[in-house]
Swiss-Prot record:
It is found in: Cytoplasm. Its cofactor is FAD. Pfam families: FAD_binding_4, MurB_C. The keyword Cell cycle applies. This is UDP-N-acetylenolpyruvoylglucosamine reductase.
Amino acid sequence: MIEELAGIDIRINEPLKKYTYTKVGGPADYLVFPRNRLELTRVVKYANNHSIPWIVLGNASNLIVRDGGIRGFVIMFNKLNTVTVDGYTIEAEAGANLIETTKVAKFHSLTGFEFACGIPGSVGGAIFMNAGAYGGEIANIFLSAKVLTPEGDIKTMTAREMAFGYRHSAIQKSGDIVISAKFALKPGDFEQISQEMNRLNYLRQLKQPLEYPSCGSVFKRPEGHFAGQLIMEAKLKGYRIGGVEVSEKHAGFMINVDHGTAKDYEHLIAHVIETVEHNSGIRLEREVRIIGEQESLNQKEKS
């Protein structure tokens, strides 16, 4: 198989915890780093022709990969990271770092992207989740995207076709994968943009446990409430299972403090959901995605 995909960076049985923000995750059968669209389509069409499962991880930020890892091809877009500016429009490849993309907007005195200046992850992942913070979200500036269909074809999707909602986009169900996207910004003042980004980054550092590995915001915001507040009222701040605990700094975050596992994360999430519902009557809904397989007995014996 590797011979047919010669020239493409493919790593066999690669531990995914080396690449995830949570620092958990078992091995990928084949971890693939395409350098361009041609390599990407080669991999996807090969996988489809040979009935090999494939998945795109983006930058693996708002995500938990189970300890058993992922079968088939796991495609990471780190090398698809070009960002260009044309007038008031920014075009970014899906693997571009979201924070770095907001810095490009600032450099060109373009406003509208400030809300995302501290959101970790990739541009593609941000579109997938309609990422947002501090009153802004991707849907507000999204123009269009080139996407790869599950069949391996490339098409363009408009903002209307994306059907954005709160932490939702149409591609969560369709299986289409963002390759690149265009964002419509407005001319602004460099100093004002810089000041706003500095303010938002200060708030993030003040309120969020950025010094620890985490999957970001674990739960969606319940209507009329804040997940972190509900978790705090349930007296779960600092609650720990294995190496993962509810952050003392922000109860909406779960941090990997001591060689935690995906199993620790899953058990802690389930405990928080159950306890908060018992305490408040409100059932929290996960924002973080959980993918992959549970660790098998053979894998445990080898580890």
